[in-house]
């Protein structure tokens, strides 16, 4: 899979951009705040219909304009695809795939698969469970429509349940709460089961990758942390947990248990890297997660996704840089950097270089 062509109109600092890419390595060089990351952001947006940097689509629209436009041509093993997205200031978006309008975001998922690696990804390791749940949700939605549907339905029911909990003192809603709990347990089972399976696969792929990066010194493992004691009867057990904690939920006015509160831990040699790992170990863990994600997607769809490396080489030591640059020969890769000193000459010789300056891109 690779992106052949990208067109932007009024996207971030680009008034208009038409650009063709090499199917292997593409490097964007330029000072900070010139628009390098914006190009990668537009590709990511075409993958899942959301930005990795903001939850407000209107921020993607160039100043004083009412809409922006993204178009990508994707070449895959079995077919070619063209994605067009219009983003409107009032918060709506229009998506066409091969000139056919699609009404559901789920129809966009999987058309263009990307894995993005940026310095911000350290938050997955270092900060709250929100970032780790978001990582799981995004990765699973890329290839599992079952997960996407289950997640959407679960969140709808969760929102409705929390509304009932907040206004409990104004009436007795026990019957409707019973219905909501059954629905949460049903959709929660889908989420928990697929998350647990994904983390097992991430551990399997990650062990090999992490061992390569650390010369066999470190062993990595990803472990799902949930309110359940086992995964044998997820739906029944989750319903019982919701039922048992109902009074507590009513008192707090919020649902305290379920996959929306789950987490996962990253262990290196049996030690939680979030609490006790060095900065280097935390960075290596993220690198492992990203490259394990690449391998999982390849295993499922039969080809590598597109890899987006946003200003990460300068953040890594020589060994980690070496691992990345030796692992991308079969993967279309987009690299942003302020200079090419951190990139091997052999890579540069094979890559397509672009200079980015004030929203203008020129091919070298």
UniProtKB/Swiss-Prot annotation:
Which CDD domains is this protein grouped with? ABC_RecF (cd03242)
- Read off the PROSITE patterns from this record: RECF_1, RECF_2
Domain of life of the source: Bacteria
Task: List positions binding ATP.
Answer: 30-37
Gene Ontology cellular component terms for the protein in this record: cytoplasm
Q: What keywords were assigned to this record?
A: ATP-binding, Cytoplasm, DNA damage, DNA repair, DNA replication, DNA-binding, Nucleotide-binding, SOS response
User: Where found, per UniProt?
Assistant: Cytoplasm
A Pfam family found in this protein is SMC_N
InterPro entries in the cross-refs: DNA-binding_RecF, DNA-binding_RecF_CS, P-loop_NTPase, RecF/RecN/SMC_N, RecF_2
Q: Which Gene3D superfamilies match?
A: P-loop containing nucleotide triphosphate hydrolases, RecF/RecN/SMC, N-terminal domain
Note whether S-adenosyl-L-methionine occurs among the keywords: no
Name the GO terms of the biological process aspect.
DNA replication; DNA synthesis involved in DNA repair; double-strand break repair; SOS response
- Function noted in UniProt: The RecF protein is involved in DNA metabolism; it is required for DNA replication and normal SOS inducibility. RecF binds preferentially to single-stranded, linear DNA. It also seems to bind ATP.
Protein name per its UniProtKB record = DNA replication and repair protein RecF
């Amino acid at each position: 899979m690779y992106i052949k062509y990208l067109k932007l109109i009024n996207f971030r600092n680009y008034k208009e951009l038409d650009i063709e890419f090499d199917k292997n390595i593409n490097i964007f060089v330029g000072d900070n705040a010139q628009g390098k990351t914006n190009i990668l952001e537009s590709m990511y947006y075409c993958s899942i219909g959301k930005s990795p940097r903001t939850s407000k689509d209107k921020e993607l629209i160039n100043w004083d304009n009412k809409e922006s436009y993204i178009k990508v041509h994707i070449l895959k093993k079995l077919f070619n695809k063209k994605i067009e997205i219009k983003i409107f200031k009032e918060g709506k978006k229009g998506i066409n795939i091969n000139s056919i309008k699609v009404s559901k975001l789920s129809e966009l998922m999987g058309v263009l698969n990307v894995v993005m690696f940026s310095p911000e990804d350290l938050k997955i390791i270092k900060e709250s469970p929100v970032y780790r749940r978001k990582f799981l949700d995004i990765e699973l939605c890329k290839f599992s429509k079952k997960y996407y549907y289950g997640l959407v339905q679960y969140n709808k029911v969760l929102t409705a349940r929390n509304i009932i909990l907040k206004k409990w003192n104004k009436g007795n809603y026990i019957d409707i709460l019973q219905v909501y709990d059954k629905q949460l347990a049903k959709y929660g089972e889908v989420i928990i089961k697929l998350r647990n399976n994904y983390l097992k696969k991430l551990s399997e792929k990650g062990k090999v990758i992490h061992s390569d990066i650390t010369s066999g010194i470190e062993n990595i493992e990803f472990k799902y942390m949930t309110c359940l004691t086992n995964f044998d009867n997820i739906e029944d057990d989750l319903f019982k947990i919701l039922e048992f904690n109902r009074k507590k939920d009513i008192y707090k006015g919020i649902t305290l248990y379920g996959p929306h509160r789950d987490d996962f831990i990253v262990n290196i040699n049996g030690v939680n890297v979030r609490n006790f790992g060095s900065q280097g170990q935390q960075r290596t863990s993220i690198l492992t997660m990203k490259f394990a994600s690449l391998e999982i997607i390849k295993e499922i769809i039969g080809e590598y996704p597109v890899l987006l490396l946003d200003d990460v080489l300068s953040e890594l030591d020589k060994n980690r840089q070496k691992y990345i640059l030796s692992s991308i020969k079969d993967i279309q890769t987009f690299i942003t950097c302020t200079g090419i000193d951190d990139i091997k000459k052999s890579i540069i010789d094979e890559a397509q270089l672009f200079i980015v300056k004030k929203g203008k891109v020129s091919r070298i």
